Regions:
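PP2C/PPM-type serine/threonine phosphatase catalytic domain
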Residues: 2-269
Length: 269
């Protein structure tokens, strides 16, 4: 388990960020294989916020190594490579290429580590970058990014067997929730021969929130329960946000969630 927090919850542009996070090993596992990153910096475009969550594969040995190594690589990227990208006229395309290159490199590096030490390991990743009035997301696996405004929206698309079955009309979301294949990933950094990240971009509106979470955070609770606990009308202050996240962690555990549980939340004023 590795968590980097390098934030100051304020910005010099017309947007101000508040952040909260939580992580819990859960009720069954001895090791927390999740890792997370929250970083903030000032740029020519104002305050920039970067959030990443990685879920080391639960049934695979050394999943915490995979998630921590990818988080470390994203941290280095934000410090060393991101400032140069801001000079690109086609920023979105350059960012997508940079992130994709990073994912492919880490996919090979984690796979090589596994071969060297004769272990299976891998990790999901969901990353969110807020720059100016825009957001950018990259996703591999089944960690998620949600947007909370007038209601809750799932921005990322799970790269799982059951989601593919839903997309192709062979399962309903209700059937998928109890399907024994619900944890089977189609994409995983370090355990997939070919990784095809999902890249998203959109405009950031004021008075909204972003929630990044691993699958352990949302297995046993509904999106509506997330919204009712974490919306701006309910969780007003930073302390409220932190308490809301912790409440949902305990709710998951009380409902016998067995996985590690991690979530990050960003409020945009």
């Amino acid at each position: 388990m590795i968590v980097y927090l390098e934030i100051h919850d304020e910005g010099t542009n017309d947007m101000k960020y508040q952040t909260a996070w939580c992580t819990d090993v859960g009720i069954r596992k001895d090791t927390n294989q999740d890792s997370a990153l929250l970083m903030q910096a000032e740029s020519v475009q104002g305050s920039v916020l970067f959030a990443v969550i990685c879920d080391g594969m639960g049934g695979l040995a050394k999943g915490e190594v995979a998630s921590a190594s990818l988080i470390q690589r994203f941290r280095n990227w934000f410090v060393r490579e991101f400032p140069l990208l801001l000079q690109e006229s086609a920023f979105s395309a350059a960012l997508s290429q940079s992130w994709n290159r990073l994912i492919q490199e880490q996919n090979r590096a984690i796979a090589d580590y596994g071969q060297q030490f004769h272990v299976n390991l891998g990790t999901t990743v969901a990353a969110l970058l807020l720059v100016g009035d825009n957001y950018y997301i990259i996703n591999v696996g089944d960690s998620r990014v949600y947007l909370l405004s007038s209601q809750i929206y799932q921005l990322t698309h799970d790269q799982t067997v059951v989601q593919k079955e839903i997309d192709e009309g062979r399962l309903t979301p209700e059937q998928a929730a109890s399907d024994p294949r619900s944890s089977v990933l189609l994409q995983c950094v370090g355990a997939s021969q070919v990784v095809a990240p999902e890249f998203l971009a959109g405009e950031v509106e004021h008075s909204t929130r972003f929630l990044l979470c691993c699958d352990g955070f949302r297995h046993e609770i509904s999106p509506q329960e997330m919204y009712e606990t974490l919306s701006r009308s309910t969780a007003v202050t930073k302390q409220d946000m932190e308490q809301g996240l912790q409440y949902l962690v305990e709710l998951n555990k009380n409902r016998n969630e067995v996985d590690n549980i991690t979530a990050l939340m960003i409020d945009v004023e």
